[in-house]
Amino acid sequence: ADYLPGLTEGRHTVCMAISEPGAGAHPKKLSTRAEFDGDKVILNGQKTYLTNGPLADLFLIMAITAELDGRRSFTTFIVPKSSEGLEITESATVDFLHPSPHCGIKLTNVVVPAVNRLGPLGDAFNAISLPMRRVEDALSATKSAGAMRHRFRLLCRAATNIADPTAEMEGALGRLSVMAEAMSAIGV
């Protein structure tokens, strides 16, 4: 709640910190942990590929808060850049995202108040990471759909330029027509 006014007034820049070196955002490979100690939380781990990280003054850090029978629970914490034990590190070069600078962070016994928890305990993966994965999947699918549409148009052009279509070609043109309707229906 302390950060909300600054966020709404544009005084804070925030960076989501999920991905880790060698793990990406895969939940089984993440290792950053948050340990509760009374009214405080102690964070240890590393994060990477932090979009706008060099500009951020607040990090939303997803960390493991429980593990039972191989299943991990993740919680997100608001961590100020000025926190003792938070070190900005270099990130791999991401040339295609040049307008958005990237960095990594190393967390060594970073202490924040437990009230810096964002959302319910153990719900960060479902509330934050899964929706982000869906957006990433959708963005990846658009590239494939665009390429598919381009190839489809080339195929249609080639098929309609045949002077004397055979019965086999007419069948192929019919299938192309059905594909065109299906692609149109899904917005490709």
Enumerate the language-model features and the residues they cover.
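Long, low-complexity C-terminal extensions of enzymes
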Residues: 182-188
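Short loop segments at secondary-structure junctions
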Residues: 37-39, 64-68, 81-84, 108-116
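Glycine-rich beta->alpha junctions and the first turn(s) of the following alpha-helix
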Residues: 89-181
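A generic structural signal for well-ordered coil/turn residues at beta-strand boundaries
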Residues: 12, 28-30, 55-57, 73, ...
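Glycine-rich flavin
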Residues: 1-51
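Buried hydrophobic positions in well-ordered alpha/beta secondary-structure cores of metabolic enzymes
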Residues: 16, 34, 43-45, 61, ...
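A short core secondary-structure module
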Residues: 46-86
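A generic structural signal for beta-strand entry/edge sites
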Residues: 38-42, 58, 102
